[in-house]
Amino acid sequence: LWPEVIDLFAGVEVILHAGDLHTLSVVEELGKLGPVYVARGNGDVGIVDDRLQDAWVLSLGSFTIGMIHHFPSPVRKTSQQLHKYMRRHFKTVPDVVVYGHTHLESIQDVDGVLCVNPGSPTLPRNQSLRYGHVGVMDLAGDRPLAVLYELFDGGFRAL
């Protein structure tokens, strides 16, 4: 885990990891900053820990957050298909969906649902080990806000 991630996440209340940890040490390191929830990814086979689940439905602030590793791309599916997928996996249509798998950073609004793929801090776009992206959400207002950050040696910048 890059030290830039630790710097960016300093002061956050909760950390949501959309999967593909590959090692539990990532959760241990992030856990020093706050509670960690992980959506089990295809790169997490064999990792057993209560902080990993196939899908999460969390109440954070006044919002419902659904988190899952595999989620259809909002640019490739209709909102009706995406809402059906949400109800199947979360039993509801949450305010925010956090997902991973593709390692492609993206923020899309799907009929009022904020769909966030933060990308990957270490394997962006499923390529070689290098600096990538993370996301940060602000849930203090009347609408959830998400910002993607690009990591680089010694820092980070909002996209």
Language model regions located:
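Short, catalytically relevant binding-site loops at active-site mouths
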Residues: 22-24, 44-45, 72-74, 104, ...
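Helix-adjacent hinge/juxtasegments
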Residues: 37-88
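Conserved beta-sheet core of the metallophosphoesterase superfamily
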Residues: 37-39, 76-147
